[in-house]
Amino acid sequence: MVTPRIGGNKGKTYWYMIYTLENKTGADRNFFLSITAKSDRKKTYSDLFLPSVERAIQRQEGRPLWGKADKFKKLKDKSAGDRKFSYTRIKDGEKRLCVAVFNEFENTSKNITIRTTGLSNDIEVIIDTDGRTLLRERIRLMHLSRPGDEYEVTLDSFKNLRMEWQKETTEIKFKDE
C-alpha cells in the first residue's frame, strides 16, 4: 500500500500490485491488458490511471515501474488513428516490471481475486443458436487472501492462494442492435 504525501491524491491510501510482463512468443506483439480486482464483499476495482500515485510507488519501491501513466504517455504520442485501439507494443524477449494501482480495499475484505485479460491470443467469436455474438477468451485469475486485522490493514500482506487460467464468455452488443 502507498499513501502519497504530495499531489492531488495526498493522504489517500492505494493498494498496488507489482508484476512482470514478458514476451516469449518469438515476435513483437501488440497487447491490451486489463486488470481488475473483486473482493469477497462483491466490490470491484479497476487498475487506475494516477501518475502521481505511480511516482510515489516508484519512490517507495526504489525502481522504475511501467504502468498506466506510461501507457497513456505513449498513446498521446501516436497519431489519432493509431490511438483508436490503445494497444501497447512489447518486443520479442522484452521484460517489463509493471504496476497496477487500485483504490484501497474494504477493511473487512479477506479475499481478493485479480482478473487479467489480454495475456493470451486465445480468443474466439461465436454466434450462438439465438444469433447472439459471443466472445470467448482466456483470462488469468489470481486468488489472494488477506489475513490480518481490519483496523491495521496497512500492515497486512496478501497471500497467494492459487492462480488459474479460465475461459470466459461475454455477449457482444453492437451499436445498431
Model-found features: residue ranges?
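Short, solvent-exposed loop/turn segments enriched in Ser/Thr/Gly
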Residues: 12-18
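Generic beta-strand structural signal
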Residues: 17, 96-98, 110
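The feature marks short-to-medium sequence segments in extracytoplasmic or secretory-pathway proteins
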Residues: 24-91, 125-150, 161, 171-177
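Short, surface-exposed ligand- or partner-binding patches at beta-edge/loop junctions that are enriched
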Residues: 104-126
